Structure formats: structure tokens, C-alpha cells
């Protein structure tokens, strides 16, 4: 499993701002709680997650809570980052799974009132091709990439990877920005050897429409290759889990219990793809058939503590250097990173 839980001090949180694979326009709710026999004093927790890879790791925890006799904790799935932001800032939810840069934006907006608990999703961006001409980043020179997410994290991540490989975006590589992933797919299917940057699970959806579409570059792996010799390597991060700082301070045991349950849920999802995919479909995140193929490529993880801080702060620094507004105008302070 891609779980790295920090206990004590060792290596042991939906933007975009945008979550690259947000799906649907309806909100789904599921309520759950611990049975009264477990403890009468347990604090109910209200959790909100953005639909897509950022919420996929929660599905086992959601299912377990639904099966309890006396539901009290509440899980919601939202279609848009703005909905998550508003409810978190207004105190309507306690914990939320959001795009990584949105967490920093919320931290700045609330004057430090939000903390990140864990990284829950690494990169989900892929270079795909209707052909077989791209084997490395260098092969993108002189080519056109169809992509969506201009002025948001997909653009900044792509620019970073191109530049670190000696390519100048807009000069060595043409990037044709589209408003939606579906437009990228249409362009991809209309040309021979066309190239696009797409997120999971949309990559999987695209491949169901054309068996000619193949993944050529995993941008998470390309980011890691750039960082491999760094003294403090960052990672390409899609989603994190955050909580209101006041809730953390007032309910440390509830937060700790949530973290334990979430870590176990991520474990289950990565180890039991078929069962997890059925749950993803049940909660209408994406269809089960899509989830079954997409989960292994969604980089669902659970990284906390010092490793989380190093990976996330480095990622936010890359965004900040290209556009400070992408992280809320300023890099978050040390108090942004939760530590048990």
C-alpha cells in the first residue's frame, strides 16, 4: 500500500484550483456513526470530500460507517471545490478532502484556521497519445499537447516538467488549452498521433471510447525523476485531507480515530481493487467499471507527518513560483502541517 503513517516521529489531507477528476453535478450524502455501545461520548464528525480520486480512498470507511446501527457521523460528496471551501470556512464541516493547493488557499483565507492532516492522492495527470511516437518528455518537442486546466495546477505541473527537461512551453511545445477534458478527447480522436494531457479517471473513460488511446507518460513518475537527487524531494500532489484547526484542538481523539480509520480505508482500497471499485460506484464517484481500471493509476495514498510536510511544501513552492495566487498569495507556515 501507499500508506506512510507517522507515529511518534518516524515515517509512520476535494482544486483548479481544481481537482483534476471531479465528476458529476449532484451532491451525495451518506450518514454514519459509531454504535452507542462503543462510546456515548464519541464526537460526531462531519466530512466533505470532492468527487474523484480525492474521495476514492474514503469509500471503505464510508461503507463501514453506513453499516453501523446508529449513524451520527456524516459524509458528503461534492461536485465542485467551491462548495467544499464554503462549508469548511463557515464551519459546516469538520474535515474535508480537497485539492492540495486549495488547502493552502483556505489556510491563507482563514488566517491559519485550516490544517492539513494528510496527503491522500498523488499525481493523476498522464500524457496520452492516439499513436506511438512519445516515449519520453524529450519526444514532446515540436508537438502540440491538448490540455485543460489553464491557469490552474495542471498548467503549472506541466510547465514545471517541461522546463526541467529543457523544453520551453509555448516555444518548444505548443499547448492548446481546452475548457473541458471532453474537448481534449475529441481533438485526440480527430487526429493521428495526437497528444493530450488528461487526468485519471478520465484517461480510463477515454480508453473505453477508443482502444488506440495509450498512456505514454506518467507525470507523477516524471516529477519524481526530476526530484530524485534533491535533498528534500517534493511530489506531484493532487489531494489532501484538511480539518478546521478549532475542531482539531477541541477534539484530538476524534481526529486521531478518523486518521486511523482513513489509513485503514486507503489500505483496503489499494489492496482490494474489485471491492473498492464497487463501493466507488455505489457512492456515485465514478462508475464501478471505470473505477476498477482507474484505481491503480489514481495514486491513492496516506502520507502524514514530516514526509507529508516535505512533499507538500515542495509541491506548493513549485506552484507559488509560477503564480502565488495558486496557493493563496503566500506559502503556508509550519502550523499548516498537522502533527500528532
Predicted regions and their residues:
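Bacterial N-terminal signal peptides
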Residues: 11-21
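Bacterial lipoprotein signal-peptidase II cleavage site
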Residues: 21-32
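Short, glycine-/small- and polar/acidic-enriched structural segments
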Residues: 35-177, 194, 200, 212-219
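Short, solvent-exposed loop/beta-turn-alpha elements that line the ligand-binding surface or hinge
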Residues: 65-71, 222-234, 300-309
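Pocket-lining segment of extracytoplasmic ligand-binding domains
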Residues: 101-102, 110, 183-279
Amino acid at each position: 500500500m501507499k500508506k506512510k503513517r507517522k507515529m511518534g516521529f518516524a515515517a509512520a489531507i476535494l482544486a483548479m484550483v481544481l481537482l483534476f477528476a471531479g465528476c458529476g453535478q449532484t451532491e451525495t450524502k451518506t450518514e454514519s456513526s459509531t454504535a452507542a455501545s462503543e462510546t456515548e461520548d464519541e464526537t460526531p464528525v462531519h466530512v466533505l470530500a470532492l468527487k474523484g480520486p480525492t474521495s476514492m480512498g474514503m469509500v471503505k470507511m464510508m461503507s463501514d460507517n453506513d453499516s453501523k446501527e446508529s449513524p451520527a457521523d456524516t459524509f458528503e460528496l461534492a461536485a465542485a471545490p467551491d462548495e467544499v471551501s464554503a462549508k469548511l470556512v463557515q464551519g459546516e464541516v469538520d474535515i474535508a478532502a480537497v485539492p492540495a493547493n486549495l488547502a493552502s488557499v483556505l489556510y491563507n483565507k482563514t488566517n491559519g484556521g485550516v490544517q492539513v492532516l494528510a496527503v491522500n492522492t498523488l499525481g493523476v495527470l498522464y500524457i496520452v497519445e492516439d499513436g506511438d511516437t512519445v516515449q519520453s518528455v524529450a519526444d514532446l518537442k515540436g508537438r502540440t499537447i491538448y490540455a485543460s486546466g489553464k491557469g490552474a495546477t495542471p498548467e503549472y505541473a506541466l510547465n514545471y516538467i517541461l522546463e526541467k527537461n529543457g523544453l520551453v512551453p509555448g516555444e518548444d511545445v505548443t499547448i492548446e488549452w481546452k475548457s473541458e477534458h471532453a474537448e481534449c478527447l475529441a481533438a485526440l480522436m480527430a487526429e493521428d498521433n495526437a497528444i493530450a494531457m488528461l487526468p485519471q479517471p478520465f484517461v480510463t473513460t477515454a480508453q473505453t471510447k477508443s482502444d488506440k488511446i495509450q498512456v505514454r507518460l506518467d507525470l507523477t513518475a516524471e516529477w519524481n525523476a526530476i526530484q530524485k537527487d534533491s535533498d528534500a524531494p517534493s511530489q506531484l500532489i493532487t489531494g489532501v485531507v484538511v480539518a478546521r484547526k478549532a475542531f482539531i484542538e477541541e477534539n484530538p481523539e476524534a481526529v486521531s480515530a478518523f486518521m486511523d480509520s482513513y489509513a485503514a480505508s486507503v489500505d483496503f482500497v489499494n489492496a482490494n481493487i474489485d471491492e473498492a471499485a464497487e463501493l466507488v460506484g455505489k457512492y456515485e464517484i465514478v462508475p464501478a467499471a471505470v473505477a476498477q481500471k482507474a484505481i491503480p493509476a489514481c495514486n491513492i495514498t496516506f502520507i502524514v507527518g514530516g514526509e507529508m510536510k516535505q512533499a507538500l511544501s515542495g509541491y506548493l513552492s513549485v506552484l507559488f513560483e509560477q503564480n502565488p495566487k495558486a496557493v493563496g498569495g503566500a506559502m503556508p507556515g509550519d502550523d499548516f502541517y498537522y502533527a500528532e
